[in-house]
């Protein structure tokens, strides 16, 4: 293995991530209970008073909080089953833990598919990223988006609303100006997606893309 490749792999393993998985067929309370049992802590409580979104939380052996929140966009039998798992900050070594938790939830009846407006969100920590590396990421995403969409079977209705592809106006300006600072990159992102107003808001209009730069 080349030294540069080995270094890239080592850096990747240090990357922090947060994952959100939308599901139905299981209540938030039941999902939190299953998680608490899986973690071996048995600790799960209703934390809606603190977290909102009708949240139930479970804690793992490291004291990290795993949230099960309501997402009203999910097509479920009832509001109690509009369940979204929100992980704490994870690292490479936590991937197997997350995978096994999802298997446990699936065996308990949880389902996640595009027909029920379910999706997966992966948040990448800023870490050592620069405006240049994020520009590279945007171009990489744009060139492979169609393959990812096909592989994940993303519903057409989501593509038109929640999972829009990379905006060409944003991408063209990004590659023309090649921003050197995060501040300039942010300007290009929000302006390129016609979402400059209210850019500090959580539900800013630019968020509903397969790739979301925040």
Predicted features and spans:
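C-terminal accessory/tail domains of diverse enzymes
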Residues: 1-114, 127-214
